[in-house]
Amino acid sequence: MKIAAILMALPLAVLASACATSSSGGAPAADAAAPMVHAKLLAGDGSARGEAMVTQAGDGLHVVVHAQGLTPGMHAVHIHMTGSCTPPDFTSAGGHWNPTGHKHGKDNPDGMHMGDMPNMIAGADGGGEMEYVIPGGTINGGATPLLDADGAAVVIHAQADDNKTDPAGNAGGRIACGVLSAG
């Protein structure tokens, strides 16, 4: 009788355990109350190029970018310091988000900007994904807020970032942009 009760309770225990993890290999589920902002990425002609999500966690800002319609190959992805994406060239987004006053690039001995992130590879279908953690960043408040008075934007560039050339890594033109906002 005890064995039958245990066997009947086992599926419920497995189900409860599954609810406490995400679908990404058993990692803890994301905190639904964690601050989050997102951006719809658009090309200069207004066509959709994907989305970006930034979530605040204990170790910094978790950035996820999903892109489409890109030229196959490497593309720089940066967070820019102004929440403005005026087409067609998106220069209204300003320079890279750099609240700490560093130089550009992970390979620069004086780097790196907080908005510097790894290059994204777009496949033959023009789609690409990139995930990165910005250590010490916050969405609001603290010494390094992403959303200051003039906001912030995510920008995809035409070429790869060389990770050292100041101020922008020789990444070429801005081909997609999205203003980060809550909601």
Question: Where do the PLM segments sit?
Answer:
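Positively charged n-region of N-terminal signal peptides that target proteins for export
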Residues: M1-L7
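N-terminal leader/targeting pre-sequences
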Residues: I3, S17-M74, I79-G183
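Bacterial N-terminal signal peptides
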Residues: L7-S17
